[in-house]
Amino acid sequence: MLLDQLVHHAPQFRVPLLKAAFLFLLVGYGTKMGLAPLHTWLPDAHSESPSMISALLSGAVLNCAFLAILRALQVCAAAGQAQFCQKLFVWFGLMSMAVAAVFVLGQTDYKRMLAYSSVEHIGILAFGIGIGGAATFGVMLHAINHSLTKAALFFVAGNILAAYKTKSTAQVRGIFHVLPASGLLWVGGFFAITGSPPFGPFLSEFTILKATLDQGHGAVAIAYIALLALMFIGMATIVLRMAQGRPSSEVKTIQPREAVLAIMPPALLAAAVLVLGIYIPPFINTALHDAAQTLGGL
């Protein structure tokens, strides 16, 4: 059946069977999108895949699974079971953020660090959908911001791996000296992905936070902020150490050259994220509002 037909006939569905179906879909697609505790494949896949594939996984594949779950939410909402689904989204979202924050602390592989960051941001998307209302617009915007930012970071991670020949955070020092352009994008991408102004993720994460507070969910909002802060601290410890310090003599001897084609893709993505933090083009704004209204937000 087409989705429109499912939505039309949803009030006639048996509620216990509908809830069971949604749970199965949440487990299946939740695994594909990396929701904790179904996320275990994601760090392994990201750390072992070529950087371009990792960028595609985080930027597109995870979002596709998320959109599939949103389609299931539409059917449940039409049957009057939106609140049941939203509670699950909130708890799975916070769990994903918590798991990501814990595993990022002391992480020794910078590509796995980025993978756990994806788990966190998938959790943010789920959390925002669970809150609903104006947060739904923030979720739609955040899906774009995360895709652009994470793709840029994985491209830069590929440049770092090509120069240093290792994924170990302990063996990568002095990126600013060895790869100046990549170092700038690496640190800038870190601030963007952790929701620092003036980048796009700050705007979308703040929109979700404001909607949470406006609906009177103070305790949940505090947990949301605390987990964001913990993730910032964990990633800052790794990223800033990699960017600063003195590179090893072996890397100095090699003196890797930064090709224009290796810098332009992440630079363009980073520029787009910066623009979205300052100004949302009307066509994107309209599309996001329409998507949010379709899901019952705004």
Regions found by a protein language model. Give the residues of each.
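Cytoplasmic/organellar membrane-interface segments at the starts of transmembrane helices
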Residues: 49, 179-181, 232-298
